[in-house]
């Protein structure tokens, strides 16, 4: 699986130009059909997702090109999931209140929060390393708010640093989280 931008036309252009590389061997990825279509629950309703599949011209391994709008093996868009994580970090309300705010079942939101809580130290450290790689003089997030707060703060600090470095008007917290984690922000391990 390879994480790519959400713009389908841009992904097709990059595939045709040979700009995507295989994570296994570094070879060039070429188009190879599509993965199965599925519907994600977005903030404003259902979102149809039919990710592109690619095949390495070097080693022959196939990869699904997952857009930064989705997390691996999740039925909701990254925007919904990351907004729930951010709500927990900033307001410190319970999972039922967050579930009501994002209009998702309470057990689903509790699962997201638990999975993220299991990984907060790994998430914080990975995003902090990326922050130092992107920004020569990074503004480090405040520490001491607890693991959950620190991990979400590291994601936010990296998103801000990417915006400054590449002169982007806004960099989504969700897209940053998906891009850096390779879609595996809530994956086991």
Locations of the language-model features?
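Glutamate identity and glutamate-enriched acidic tracts
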Residues: 5, 12, 19, 48, ...
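General helical secondary-structure elements
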Residues: 30-34, 69-70, 106, 111, ...
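Long C-terminal interaction/binding lobes of large macromolecular proteins
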Residues: 1-6, 122-189
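Compositionally biased, intrinsically disordered low-complexity regions
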Residues: 33-35, 96, 165, 184-185
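Generic detector of leucine side chains in alpha-helical contexts
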Residues: 15, 20, 29, 40, ...
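Short, positively charged, Gly/Tyr-enriched micro-motifs
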Residues: 55-144
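N-terminal juxtadomain amphipathic helix
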Residues: 5-58, 62-65
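Generic serine detector
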Residues: 21-24, 37, 54, 69, ...
């Amino acid at each position: 699986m390879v994480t790519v931008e959400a713009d389908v036309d841009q992904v097709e252009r990059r595939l045709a130009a040979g700009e995507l590389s295989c994570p296994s061997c570094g070879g060039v990825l070429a188009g190879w059909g599509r993965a199965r279509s599925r519907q994600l629950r977005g903030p404003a309703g259902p979102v149809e997702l039919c990710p592109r599949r690619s095949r390495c011209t070097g080693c022959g391994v196939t990869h699904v090109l997952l857009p930064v709008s989705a997390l691996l093996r999740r039925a909701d868009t990254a925007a919904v999931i990351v907004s729930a994580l951010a709500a927990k970090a900033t307001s410190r309300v319970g999972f039922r209140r967050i579930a009501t705010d994002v209009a998702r079942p309470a057990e689903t939101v509790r699962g997201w929060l638990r999975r993220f809580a299991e990984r907060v130290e790994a998430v914080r450290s990975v995003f902090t390393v990326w922050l130092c790689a992107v920004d020569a003089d990074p503004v480090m997030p405040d520490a001491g708010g607890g693991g959950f707060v620190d991990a979400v703060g590291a994601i936010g600090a990296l998103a801000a640093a990417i915006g400054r470095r590449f002169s982007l008007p806004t960099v989504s917290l969700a897209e940053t989280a998906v891009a850096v984690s390779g879609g595996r922000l809530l994956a086991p391990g």
